[in-house]
């Protein structure tokens, strides 16, 4: 048997370090066993999926050295490798399950489903969708003939226990009563993740599925689908989730999570990959610094620890420093620095904003310095403003951060629209509102267009600087945060 693993990201945002972490372990497992590593794009969420996000994911993973054998950009014998391009095949599989009695047409309205949830909740049951969902055969035929909208749901046992075999955790038991009748095919004909995932893994010959532990509760549905189809199920391995230093689930609200951020900060890809390799796994000799090839050579999935691995940016900085000092000659250091500092695409985007302000080349460094920095050296007094008190400044920074965290289409125009709407909702003049934003992003209120700066810096660096500025100003306590969250919600922006 040829071992085949896969990573299947959704192109709905910035390339996440969690995606890279899971991709790395899948790659190492496949290579260790002389197998193949596949990349598949799971873009069934057409409303949120973008081509730009897909390209960002591919570029980021390649930057880290995580190369795949088959995928949407390199092709392969099991293509296409985008689920949106495989849409035509999922419907028949769902219909086959209906014919076999393993799934059913569901015509329930959202209101009816809400009522079912409330009834189950009142009975102390799991509020997932189960119970009185199926209609008599004659009624189903009448509804289908009338063209009523429907979804296809899988049938799930009402009682008993589902046993899942996990490569790290052994036998996992989940009560069937906790598993809902999952939608397999949506009313628009698109499959849900669960159907597409199982069908694609089977058709692509995936033998081992290494994924995050957040998918454990979905494993019974997947096991049931494999049984319904009469297919062999891949071996499962649920990896521990990455954590913030405070042990909470890794999130962009507390840590930069985009791979793009670390590239922009000037981290070495080898160091980032090395650090991700230490997330819950260790070399047999416990050394901290190792190459991807060394990790592959020594990889043993049983060395993965189930304790939540902590993604600590300061620890990553330390490791990156070790790589710089121990692995790069002066010439290599200079070449890498030039590659990062004089990135042609970045410079091309930056020049129009500084050329008109410069009289001699030595003017450029002070004007552009903040574009090539990490977190700026800020002090609370930098935010002193004659019209805004400290409380207002902190709210400007926090509200801007929350608003921009929700922005999926990052550009000067979308940023401006968000900022303008916030300033209006807070009843602040644009100039007064922007003062704190200028200082947070550029380190001074006297800089060239901060909207352009944020567009060029990108979402993760922009958010990180706003978060850093808020910390410099003292931030909010947990109690204050709840109050401020209510204020933000009341703005309606």
From Swiss-Prot:
Question: Which protein is depicted?
Answer: Glutamate--tRNA ligase
Q: What's the chief localization of this chain?
A: cytoplasm
Q: Which UniProt keywords apply?
A: Aminoacyl-tRNA synthetase, ATP-binding, Cytoplasm, Ligase, Nucleotide-binding, Protein biosynthesis
**Which InterPro entries does the entry link to?**
aa-tRNA-synth_I_cd-bd, aa-tRNA-synth_I_codon-bd_sub2, aa-tRNA-synth_I_CS, aa_tRNA-synth_I_cd-bd_sf, Glu-tRNA-ligase_bac/mito, Glu/Gln-tRNA-synth, Glu/Gln-tRNA-synth_Ib_cat-dom, GluQ/Sye
Give the organism, scientific name.
Answer: Marinobacter nauticus (strain ATCC 700491 / DSM 11845 / VT8) (Marinobacter aquaeolei)
Protein family (similarity comment): Belongs to the class-I aminoacyl-tRNA synthetase family. Glutamate--tRNA ligase type 1 subfamily.
Q: Which domain of life is it from?
A: Bacteria
Return the PROSITE patterns for the record.
AA_TRNA_LIGASE_I
**Locus of motif 'HIGH' region:** 9-19
Q: Please provide, alphabetically and separated by semicolons, the GO molecular function terms listed in this UniProt record.
A: ATP binding; glutamate-tRNA ligase activity; tRNA binding; zinc ion binding
What does the UniProt entry say about where the protein is found?
A: Cytoplasm
């Amino acid at each position: 048997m040829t071992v085949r693993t896969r990573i299947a990201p959704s192109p709905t945002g910035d390339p996440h370090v969690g995606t890279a972490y899971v991709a790395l372990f899948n790659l190492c497992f496949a290579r260790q066993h002389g197998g193949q590593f596949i990349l598949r794009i799971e873009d069934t969420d057409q409303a949120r999926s973008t081509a730009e996000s897909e390209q960002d994911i591919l570029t980021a993973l390649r930057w880290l050295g995580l190369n795949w054998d088959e995928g949407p950009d390199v092709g392969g014998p099991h293509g296409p490798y985008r689920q949106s391009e495989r849409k035509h095949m999922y419907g028949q599989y769902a219909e086959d399950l209906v014919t076999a009695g393993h799934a059913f047409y569901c015509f329930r309205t959202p209101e009816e489903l809400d009522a079912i949830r409330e009834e189950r909740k009142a009975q102390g049951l799991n509020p997932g969708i189960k119970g009185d969902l199926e209609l008599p055969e004659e009624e189903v035929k009448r509804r289908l003939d009338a063209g009523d909208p429907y979804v296809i749901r899988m049938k799930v046992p009402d009682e008993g226990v589902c046993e899942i075999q996990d490569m790290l955790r052994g036998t996992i038991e989940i009560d069937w009563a906790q598993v809902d009748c999952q939608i397999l095919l949506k009313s628009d004909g698109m499959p849900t993740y669960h159907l597409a995932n199982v069908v694609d893994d089977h058709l692509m010959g995936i033998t081992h599925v290494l994924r995050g532990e957040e998918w454990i509760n979905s494993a019974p549905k997947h096991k049931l689908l494999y049984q319904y189809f009469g297919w062999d199920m891949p071996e499962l391995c649920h990896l521990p989730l990455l954590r913030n230093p405070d042990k909470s689930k890794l999130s962009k609200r507390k840590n930069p999570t985009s791979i793009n951020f670390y590239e922009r900060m000037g981290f070495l890809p080898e160091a980032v990959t090395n650090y991700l390799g230490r997330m819950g796994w260790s070399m047999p000799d416990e050394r901290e610094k190792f190459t991807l090839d060394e990790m592959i050579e020594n990889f043993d999935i049983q060395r993965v620890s189930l304790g939540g691995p902590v993604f600590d940016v300061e620890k990553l900085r330390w490791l990156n420093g070790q790589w710089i000092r121990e692995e790069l000659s002066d010439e290599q250091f200079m070449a890498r620095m030039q590659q990062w500092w004089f990135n042609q695409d970045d410079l091309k985007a930056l020049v129009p904003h500084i050329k008109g302000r410069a009289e001699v080349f030595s003017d450029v460094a002070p004007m552009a310095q903040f574009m090539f920095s990490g977190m700026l050296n800020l002090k609370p007094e930098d935010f002193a403003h004659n019209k805004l008190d400290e409380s207002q400044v902190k709210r400007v920074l926090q509200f801007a951060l929350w608003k921009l965290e929700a922005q999926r289409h990052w550009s000067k125009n979308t940023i401006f629209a968000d900022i303008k709407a916030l300033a209006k909702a807070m009843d602040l003049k644009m100039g007064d509102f922007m003062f704190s934003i200028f200082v947070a992003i550029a380190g001074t209120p006297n800089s060239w267009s901060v909207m352009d700066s944020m567009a060029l810096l990108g979402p993760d660096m922009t958010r990180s600087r706003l978060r850093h500025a808020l910390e410099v100003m003292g931030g909010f306590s947990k109690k204050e945060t709840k109050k401020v969250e209510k204020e933000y919600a009341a703005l309606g922006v």
